[in-house]
UniProtKB/Swiss-Prot annotation:
It holds the Pfam family Ribosomal_L30. One of its GO terms (cellular component) is cytosolic large ribosomal subunit. One of its GO terms (biological process) is translation. Part of the 50S ribosomal subunit. This is Large ribosomal subunit protein uL30. It comes from Myxococcus xanthus (strain DK1622). One of its GO terms (molecular function) is structural constituent of ribosome. It comes from the Bacteria.
Length: 89
């Protein structure tokens, strides 16, 4: 099971706790939607900001979150590729 969480109201003037909760749900701006695993933690976070979000239960699993490479690793890979390109020329 998964939960579709959508930010339907502006969080202007919300307390810092609510802002942290909204960020924790992965919502960044008005109208954002996220498909999250249905866990007690996610339900509790959604309950805390229930006046700002809508919840919808969706069948199936939530997709695994995309992970970015840390900046140091990405920079190192670009440097190695650049050096390899320079050595060929």
């Amino acid at each position: 099971m998964a939960l579709k969480v959508k930010l339907v109201k502006s969080f202007a003037g919300a307390s810092s706790d609510m802002l942290d909760t909204i960020r924790g749900l992965g919502l960044k701006k008005f109208g954002d939607e996220r498909l999250l695993k249905d866990t007690p933690a996610v339900r509790g976070m959604a309950f805390k900001v229930k006046h700002l979000v809508t919840l919808e239960t969706v069948s199936g699993d939530a997709p695994a979150p995309k992970r970015r490479k840390p900046a140091k690793i990405a920079l190192r890979e670009r440097a190695i590729a650049y050096q390899a390109k320079q050595n060929k020329a």
